[in-house]
Amino acid sequence: MSQQSQQHFDVIVVGGGHAGTEAALAAARLGVKTLLLTHNIDTLGQMSCNPAIGGIGKGHLVKEIDALGGVMAKAADKAGIQFRTLNSSKGPAVRATRAQADRQLYKQAIRYALETQPNLSIFQQGCDDLIVENDRVTGVVTQMGLKFTAKTVVLTVGTFLGGQIHIGLDNYQGGRAGDPPSNALAKRLRALPLRVERLKTGTPPRIASHSVDFSVMQEQPGDNPTPVFSYMGSRSDHPQQIPCYITHTNENTHEIIRSGLDRSPMYSGVIEGVGPRYCPSIEDKIVRFADKGSHQIFVEPEGLNTFEIYPNGISTSLPFDVQQRLVQSIKGFENAHITRPGYAIEYDYFDPRDLKQSLETKVINGLFFAGQINGTTGYEEAGAQGLIAGLNAALQAQDKESWAPRRDQAYMGVLIDDLSTLGTQEPYRMFTSRAEYRLLLREDNADMRLTEIGRNLGLVDDERWAAFNKKMESVEQEKQRLKTTWVHKDHASVEQINALVKSPVTKEVSGEELLRRPEIHYKDLALTDFFAPGLEDPLAAEQVEIQIKYAGYITRQQEEIAKQQRHENTLLPSPFDYAKIKGLSNEVVAKLNDHQPETVGKAARISGITPAAVSMLLVHLKKQGLLRKSA
């Protein structure tokens, strides 16, 4: 292969974190020639902050990434050293999987996936510049001055754009601890007609486990049997399982923190970027919740072959001497040795309202953004965006139409729609409460929602497709069996069934009717003589129970979605000057001109846009012949 051909690609992905790896893998799965540029091959898939995958809302994203053929769930299964199902006592919509991960095992799993993926090349070089011609990106320039050309480029640069690390009143440039920032690229992007702001995030000090007294802490074991993250995974993938621990801050801790606030970069005005609301620093907690006597700390191992632990809950940028005193004031940490100081990092992000649903920028064709550059926080949010951006970069390189999930299809759709419609002024984190259709967007049915779409797009391989079809066939056959299998009230096995129910069976009843009763679970029904044997596949069995038990609620939500779909499919002209529409208030005009929503549905979700304003908008555009339906 000539040197010239080696330097031309269909898709270039800049950055090898959680967004970049999913983007590069997605593009390569579509069969296009893909280059992943990373400043350091050894940090591919690195967990820069907490050593965990999943959680409320986040676990849903991981399942969706997996349903579309992504790598995050598989890597979590291979690296997970403690698995738990959160909200296990609540309804299926809000149940979520979380895995404590071994950092090194996770990186190994990601790197192996990248290095064995056909159509994907990896090159170690930072990116300093974009090649832009006639408002279209055509390539990148590396630190060495090497030029790589491409049809599309995906930027997944994390916290590296103009990164500034703060510990107390001291600060220095960095993309994260130990890594240089991407200042040249940040300067280049600031020269583009895109809105840019600053955000900040932080991380706690790391502690040597042999200096910690775990005996005075509350042990937090994982679930047994352990949940499995990937639809293609199994418990045999899991390494050794170990516990986490819980301890708490106290009034002495809080007084130490308060005494150091005058040297805090957050409270002395040094940091201007807004931090994550749902993962605040310990100094933020003490100030905002001054009446609270203690705060919970999850003491999490960083891996099986390291002595470092991650004290989840005391993220801080206080001076190091204050960090030492606050850590040693905590029960079990009295003799704690800090191996790495906590710090805050400030970085550039770009207003995601300047993005299309495909995550392509509106002003530079072929340029896609994913991850923290869009104002999000979290590995899972980054991975979800990366997959969609990489997919659409590859589709555009093949001259195909873009695809992005709708709000009623996936949490990915909620994430992208929230960002591109509403923007964000603080690091955006996913929660189940953000999804209005969460009864349909469950962890258990992510494959049912997305795998067929992924197959049609080219994201899903033969093995996953075969496994999915086998599961779906089992679910449908078992639902039909329960619907058509009736037990008479005088049958010998009714005694077993009556032991499961609150009110005894008084007439002939089907398995489906029994399973609709809230107190009966599929696994118990399948153990009775009459309805045995049940399904061996626990995922298929879970699906049967949920589909039957919640059928009425699911149908109602599907009807609601059908009503809303009319607005979601009605496209708005872009760009458009909404001042031309008589009757709209100045506030509505300003917001519509600022957001430039792609559809009527997106316009209706902008804060301050009333139903009356939407009606006026529709009437005017219809008269002008400017309304059209999406394909």
From Swiss-Prot:
Needed cofactors, names only, are: FAD
Principal location listed in the UniProt entry: cytoplasm
Q: Which GO terms describe its molecular function?
A: flavin adenine dinucleotide binding
Q: Where in the cell is it found?
A: Cytoplasm
Listed GO biological process terms: tRNA methylation; tRNA wobble uridine modification
Q: Which InterPro entries match?
A: FAD/NAD-bd_sf (IPR036188), GIDA_C_N (IPR049312), MnmG (IPR004416), MnmG-rel (IPR002218), MnmG-rel_CS (IPR020595), MnmG_C (IPR026904), MnmG_C_subdom (IPR047001), MnmG_C_subdom_sf (IPR044920)
Per the record, a Pfam family? GIDA_C_1st
Q: Kindly state one GO CC term assigned in the UniProt record.
A: cytosol
Identify the domain of life: Bacteria
So where does FAD get bound? G15, G16, G17, H18, A19, G20
Quick one: which residues bind NAD(+)? 275-289
- Looking at the keywords, is Cytoplasm present? yes
Signal sequence segment: none
The UniProt family comment states:
Belongs to the MnmG family.
> What's the subunit arrangement here?
Homodimer. Heterotetramer of two MnmE and two MnmG subunits.
Q: What does this protein do?
A: NAD-binding protein involved in the addition of a carboxymethylaminomethyl (cmnm) group at the wobble position (U34) of certain tRNAs, forming tRNA-cmnm(5)s(2)U34.
Q: What is this protein called?
A: tRNA uridine 5-carboxymethylaminomethyl modification enzyme MnmG
Q: Which organism is it from?
A: Idiomarina loihiensis (strain ATCC BAA-735 / DSM 15497 / L2-TR)
